[in-house]
Amino acid sequence: MQTYNAGTFDVIVVGAGHAGVEAGLASGRMGAKTLMLTINLDMVAFMPCNPSVGGPAKGVVVREIDALGGEMGRNTDKTYIQMRMLNTGKGPAVRALRAQADKWDYQHEMKHTIEKEENITLRQGLVDRLVIEDGVCKGVITNSGAIYYAKTVVITTGTFSRGEIIVGELRYSSGPNNQQPSVKLSEHLEELGFELRRFKTGTPPRVKSSTIDYSKTEEQPGDDHPRAFSFDTVEMLLDQLPCWLTYTNETTHEIIQANLHRSPMFTATKKGTGARYCPSIEDKIVRFSDKPRHQIFLEPEGKNTEEVYVQGLSTSLPEEVQREMLRTIPGLENVEMMRVGYAIEYDAVMPDQLWPSLETKLVEGLFTAGQINGTSGYEEAAGQGLMAGINAARKVFAKEPVILGRDQAYIGVLIDDLVTKGTEEPYRLLTSRAEYRLLLRHDNADLRLTEIGHEIGLISDERYERFLAKQSAIEAEKERLQKTRIKPTAEVQAMLKEIGSGELKDGILAADLLRRPEITYDKIAQIVSRETFVTDEIAEQVEIQIKYEGYIQKSNLQVEKMKRMEDKKIPENIDYDAISGLATEALEKLKKIEPLSIAQASRISGVNPADISILLVYIEQGKIAKRDKEKA
C-alpha cells in the first residue's frame, strides 16, 4: 500500500479507552502537540464491561488520578447514576468510593472534553506498525497508509490487541463489544522482539429492565449525601438510581455443572489466562462448590436505556445456556437477554519489559499503558495512562520522568508491581498489595499528590490555592484541638456516659479525647465551640490524623527505612555476570528487570536477601575503587 506523510506531532496515543484518554489529555494539557488515534470515534472511553468506577483500592486510584490532574474523577462526578461509600464500618485505610456510571453519558462527556482541548487532535484510524529508527520510535503507520511522526508514542490498545471473542463453541476475531480488533500491531510488536502473552477477561449478559421482577430482589440505594471523586466538584447529582441484589441457587449451579464441557474455561478452546479476582460464574461454581448461592447485582447501564448489567454472572457459556441459567435466578424468571455474555482473549505485553516510567526497554520513546500491560480494570488502566502520558510529554521536553513511590500512591504500587514482578495473570489492584495502605487513603489523595500535579502543570494555580487553603485549615484545627482543654463538667460527663466512654477525672486536651475510639469529631464539636466554619472534609481529615497519629508515625518510619534503600541506586550498565556469588535465578531476574535501586531489586521475586547483600558489597567496592582512582 502507498504511504503518505499525514503529519508530525510531539506525542501520539494509540487507542482511546480509559488509559488512552488519560494519556492524551495529560500530554495535551502539558503543552505537547498530541494525536489520539482510535479504531472507532464512537467508542472513546467506552465501558465494555461493568458500568462502574471505583471500589476498594480502585476508588483511591480515581482520587489519585484527580489529584494529579487527570479526568476520570471529574467525568464520573458529572455522569454517575449512583454513588456509595463502601466499608464505612471499617477503618479509613479500606474505605472506598464507588459510582455507578451512566456508561453512555460517561463516554460522550469524555469525548467532548478531549475535543475541546486545543493541543489534541482526535482522529479515527487503525495503527498497524510503528516507525522505528535505530531503536527509537519515531511514529506510527495506519492501515490506510498514513504515516504520523512523533517524538514519543503511547500504546493503549487494551483488549483490542489480536482480540478474540468466545461464546461456548463460537470463537471469532473481534475487539470488545464486537468492535474491529487490532491484529497487525501485535504481530509487529512480536517482530520487534517484545514478549507477548494471551490473557482473558469476560463480561456477563445484559438483560431488559422491564422484564425483571424487582419485587423479588433487594434494593441497593445510593448514599443520601454522596461524596465526590474530584476536588473540583462542588454540586453532587442527587437524582440517583438504585441497584438490586439477588442470588444464584442450586438449580442455577446444576445447569452450569451440566454444561461445563461446553465452557471455554474448561476446554482446550481457552488459551488465555483469566483474572483470579474476577472469576466467571463457571469458575466460581467449580472453585466454591460448597457455596449454595452467589451474589448477583443488577446494575442499570444508564438513565436512558433498558439494559441492565448482571454483575457476578460473567460467563462464556453458549447463548442458550446463559438464557436458561438467568431464568433460574429470583426476579429473572421471565427476563429477556439483550446481549450475550462472552469471554475475550487478547495480547498483553509482559510488563517487566518496561521501565518504571512505562517506557519500553526495547524501544526508546515507546510507552505502553493499560490492559496491554497485563492489568484488569478501568481504574488501573486510567492510572497507567495518566503516568505514561505525563512521562511521554516530559520526554519530549527533555525532563526527568515522574515515578510515584509505593508510599505515595496506589498508582505507584501498581506500576512497581508490574515492572518489578511482572504478572502471570490479569493484575487487579487490591488494598492488600499496598504495604503502606494507612498512608494511601481515599481521603488524603489530594494531600499526597496535588503538589506533584501542580508542579508538572496539570493542576491550575487557582485549584492549587484552594488546596493550600484546605491544608492550612486542617493544620489550624488540629492545633486548636491540641491546645484546647476540656473540663469534666456535668454536661461533658453525661455525654461521655451516654456513648459508653469513661468519665473524665481531670481536664483533658480535646485532641487526646478525640483519640478515644468511640469519640468522633462531631462529639468534640458539641463540647468545644468553633470560631470558624469547618467543612466535613476538613473535620474528617482532622479526626483521622489525630486518632491514627501513632499508626501513621509507625508507617512513616517504615517508609523512611524503605527510602534509604531506594536512595541506593544501582549504576547504569552494571555487569551482573561479573558479580560472583549471585544465585542463578537472581542473576537471570536482575539482568531481565534491570532494577534502578536496591529497594526495587529486593522486591524482585527470586532475589533473596543474600543476593541483595552481595549486590550491595559489589556496588560499594565499585564506589571505593572509583574514589581511589579519582584521588590518584
Swiss-Prot record:
Basic and acidic residues bias: start-end ranges: 215-226
GO molecular function, one term: flavin adenine dinucleotide binding
Pfam families: GIDA, GIDA_C_1st, SAM_GIDA_C
UniProt keywords, alphabetically: Cytoplasm, FAD, Flavoprotein, NAD, tRNA processing
Domain of life per record: Bacteria
Location(s) in or outside the cell: Cytoplasm
Keyword hit for Metal-binding: no
UniProt GO cellular component terms: cytosol
Xref: InterPro entries: FAD/NAD-bd_sf, GIDA_C_N, MnmG, MnmG-rel, MnmG-rel_CS, MnmG_C, MnmG_C_subdom, MnmG_C_subdom_sf
Cofactor: FAD
Disordered: annotated segments: 203-226
GO biological process, one term: tRNA methylation
SUPFAM superfamilies found in the cross-reference section: FAD/NAD(P)-binding domain (SSF51905)
Keyword Calcium (UniProt): no
Chain positions recorded as FAD binding sites: 15-20, 127, 182, 371
Positions of NAD(+) binding: 274-288
Function (record text): NAD-binding protein involved in the addition of a carboxymethylaminomethyl (cmnm) group at the wobble position (U34) of certain tRNAs, forming tRNA-cmnm(5)s(2)U34.
HAMAP family to which the protein is assigned, alphabetical: MnmG_GidA
Assembly description: Homodimer. Heterotetramer of two MnmE and two MnmG subunits.
Name of the molecule in the record: tRNA uridine 5-carboxymethylaminomethyl modification enzyme MnmG
Species for this entry: Listeria monocytogenes serotype 4b (strain F2365)
